[in-house]
Amino acid sequence: MAAKDVKFDTDARDRMLRGVNILADAVKVTLGPKGRNVVIDKSFGAPRITKDGVSVAKEIELSDKFENMGAQMVKEVASRTNDEAGDGTTTATVLAQAIIKEGLKAVAAGMNPMDLKRGIDLATSKVVEAIKAAARPVNDSHEVAQVGTISANGEAQIGRFIAEAMQKVGNEGVITVEENKGLETEVEVVEGMQFDRGYLSPYFVTNADKMTAELDDVYILLHEKKLSSLQPMVPLLEAVIQSQKPLLIIAEDVEGEALATLVVNKLRGGLKIAAVKAPGFGDRRKAMLQDIAILTGGQVISEDLGMKLENVTIDMLGRAKKISINKDNTTIVDGNGDKAEIDARVAQIRNQIEETSSDYDREKLQERVAKLAGGVAVIRVGGMTEVEVKERKDRVDDALNATRAAVQEGIVVGGGVALIQGGKALDGLTGENPDQNAGITIVRRALEAPLRQIAQNAGVDGSVVAGKVRESNEKSFGFNAQTEEYGDMFKFGVIDPAKVVRTALEDAASVASLLITTEAMIADKPEPKSPAGGPGMGGMGGMDGMM
C-alpha cells in the first residue's frame, strides 16, 4: 500500500480552499447574460468553447492532491445540480464558494464547525421554503421562451425554438437536441409514434423519390418471435388481400423464405405490404410491442400467451391511418387505439418512472410516455463551424432543462434576485447559540454572491447593485445585466425556474457544510522520482596481457 500524506486543521483547510477557488473562479466567469467564454483544450480536434458551468467544472483536475480534493467537492455541487435540475450549475458553484469562504473564516476565528453547519442547514431550509412559496406557475409559451432565453445566456432565438417545440409536443413530449449539418437552427416535430427500425428490404419502397414506404389505412401484425415461413399466416394474408388494405408486419425478424415471399407478393402487386424489425431488445422489446398494440388497438401475437400465427384473425391486428417507413425509422400516425387504454398505459409507465433508480431506464421510459402521449420534437442546432455548433448545443441543452424545470415547479424572479428575496425570510431567525447564528449570517451573505457575480461580469460594481436590490421593498425589483437597468424583472422577462434556484442552493449548502467540518485530509504521497541512470561504464582497460 502506498504511503499517505496527512494534513490537519488550518493547513488542510487552506489547501482545500485554494482548490475550491481555482475551480469556482474558472466557472463563475460564465454567469449571467454577459458571462464570458471558457476555452478548453482537447487532446484531439479543435479546442472547445463553452459557457456551460458544469462542462468547465468537469475539465478541471489539479496536480496538488489536497487542492484537487477541494476542487472535486465543488465539482460535485455542479454535477448534482445538473443531474437534478439540468441547469443552475454556475449559480450553485458561486454559492458553494461563498459559503465555504465565509465558513472557513469563522472556523479559523475559533467557532464550532458543527454548530456552523447546523446554522447553515437551518437557514438553507428557510430560504428554500421562501423560494417555493414565491414560485408561480408558467402561464404561456411566452414565459417558456423567456426562461429558455435567460438560460441560453440571452439568445432569444433559442428560447423561441424551445417554446415552439414544447407547444407542439406538450409538456410530456420528448424534445431532443442534435447537431445540424447546415447553418440554420430548426425544429422538426415527429407526430405519432416513431421507432428506430427501417424496412427490411428496399423492395417495400412505395415512394422511389424519397425512398420511403408509405402505407395508408393499414393493418399491423405484431409478432414477438422471428418469422421464417409464411405458411401459418396464409389464412390471415388472404383475409388482408380480401380487405384490399395494406399490411405492416412488425416482428423480431423476418428472414429467408418469409421475406422472399413477401417481396415477390409486393412486386407482383398482389399485396401492399412492408416488414420491419421490432424496436428495442429483450424485455424492453416486449414492452414496446405492447405500447404499439395499445396505440393501434391490436394484440401482440405471443407464444407466452398461447397464441399461434395460424389462429390469428384480422380483428386481432392493429390499425393506423398512415405509416411511413424509411431505411432507419418507422412512424405510426393516428393509431386506432382506445384513448382510455392509452391513458392507462401512460399512467402505468409513469409509475415505473417514479420507481426506477437508473437514469438510463428513466430516459427510455420517458421516451415511451412521449411516444404514446405527445410526440417527439427535434431541435437541430446549426452554425458556421463545428466549435460554434457544439457551444450552441450546450446552451440549447441548458435552456431545455431550465424550461422543463420551470414547467415542473414554476418560476421566480431571475438574475439572482430570488435568492436575495428568499434571504429576507432569515430576518429574525436565530439559532440555539452564537455559532449557529454565525452559520445563518454566512448563508445570508452568500445569497448575494450570484447577483454580485452577474453584475461584475457585466462590468458593474456588484456591491452597489446588491445593496440597491436588497434595500428595495418590491419583490420583483432587480438589475437587468443585459440592458444594465433596474426595474421589475418579470416585465424585463428575466425569470428563473424555482427548481433550478432551489436545487442550486440546497446542493451548494450541502457540500459546503461538509468542507467546513473537515479537520483532516489524506492523500497518496507523491512517488519519489527514481534517480537518473549513472554514466555508462567505460571499457575495461589494463587487461592487455590476458590471452
Swiss-Prot record:
S-S bridge residues: none
Q: What is its main location?
A: cytoplasm
Q: Does the keyword Membrane apply?
A: no
What's the EC number here? 5.6.1.7
Extract the GO molecular function terms from the UniProt entry: ATP binding; ATP-dependent protein folding chaperone; isomerase activity; unfolded protein binding
Q: Which GO terms describe its cellular component?
A: cytoplasm
Output the InterPro entries linked to this UniProt entry: Chaperonin_Cpn60_CS, Cpn60/GroEL, Cpn60/GroEL/TCP-1, GroEL-like_apical_dom_sf, GROEL-like_equatorial_sf, TCP-1-like_intermed_sf
Task: Give the domain of life.
Answer: Bacteria
Map out region (Disordered) in residue numbers.
525-547
Q: Where are the compositionally biased (Gly residues) regions? A: 533-547
UniProt-listed GO biological process terms = protein refolding
* Compartments it resides in: Cytoplasm
Pfam families xrefs: Cpn60_TCP1
* Swiss-Prot/TrEMBL keywords: ATP-binding, Chaperone, Cytoplasm, Isomerase, Nucleotide-binding
> Which parts of the sequence bind ATP?
T30, L31, G32, P33, K51, D87, G88, T89, T90, T91, G415, D496
User: Top enzyme class of this protein?
Assistant: isomerase
Question: Per the record, what are the reactions this protein catalyses?
Answer: ATP + H2O + a folded polypeptide = ADP + phosphate + an unfolded polypeptide
Family statement: Belongs to the chaperonin (HSP60) family.
NCBIfam families referenced in this protein's UniProt entry, alphabetically: GroEL, PRK00013.1, PRK12849.1, PRK12850.1, PRK12851.1
Subunit composition? Forms a cylinder of 14 subunits composed of two heptameric rings stacked back-to-back. Interacts with the co-chaperonin GroES.
* Function description: Together with its co-chaperonin GroES, plays an essential role in assisting protein folding. The GroEL-GroES system forms a nano-cage that allows encapsulation of the non-native substrate proteins and provides a physical environment optimized to promote and accelerate protein folding.
Q: What is this protein called?
A: Chaperonin GroEL
What is the native source organism of this protein? Cereibacter sphaeroides (strain ATCC 17029 / ATH 2.4.9)
